[in-house]
Amino acid sequence: MSDLRGLSGQQIVKILCNKLGFAISGRSGSHVRLSKDTPQGKVGTVVPIHSEVKIGTLKGILKLAKINEEEFRKFL
């Protein structure tokens, strides 16, 4: 199983957009807002564009995006 450590913000954005159907909905400084329409409504999250995103921050990003870690790990 791939480790979630050491991912950059840019890598996270690419996975969320290219593999999980999110789209960039805005940018503010070093943060990118992503959103996705689902049958339950709109889901959004914010990803900091840092060279390495800490594991706790990544878990928070995934929680807001309503994606479990196992689903995200499939695309690493």
For each of these PLM feature ranges, what is it?
Residues 1-76:
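Basic nucleic-acid-binding interfaces
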